Amino acid sequence: MAGWNAYIDNLMADGTCQDAAIVGYKDSPSVWAAVPGKTFVNITPAEVGVLVGKDRSSFYVNGLTLGGQKCSVIRDSLLQDGEFSMDLRTKSTGGAPTFNVTVTKTDKTLVLLMGKEGVHGGLINKKCYEMASHLRRSQY
């Protein structure tokens, strides 16, 4: 879906994010658009299923993965009306830096953003939420 790439370009434009994706989660979950060569382009249907699934407690204990990147859940309001967001942090491997991640949900899509090193999670959350609100108004 080439038209979705413009949304990714918009999310990446200010330089605060290192990765972004729009993922369809209804029927056959798949990545509609993502930053080429980054983590979110590799998100699997199983990972999407965990994000939107009914079990909201196991990932607090076990974490979850996005495109194979392990993440810790900080706040989960993804299925709550009016909030539709989840805040995560990547898990460090070998002392590497960790990054803030936000996932927001619309009727048909998940919007995912990963901030660059040192970018506050609140900034990522706000940007992700605003894109999801726009998509919701556009019937997505």
Swiss-Prot record:
The gene is PFN1. It comes from the Eukaryota. This is Profilin-1. Phosphorylation at Ser-138 reduces its affinity for G-actin and blocks its interaction with HTT, reducing its ability to inhibit androgen receptor (AR) and HTT aggregation. GO terms for biological process: actin cytoskeleton organization; modification of postsynaptic actin cytoskeleton; modulation of chemical synaptic transmission; negative regulation of actin filament bundle assembly; negative regulation of actin filament polymerization; negative regulation of stress fiber assembly; neural tube closure; positive regulation of actin filament bundle assembly. Belongs to the profilin family. Expressed in epididymis (at protein level). InterPro entries: PFN (IPR048278), PFN_euk (IPR005455), PFN_sf (IPR036140), Profilin1/2/3_vertebrate (IPR005454), Profilin_CS (IPR027310).
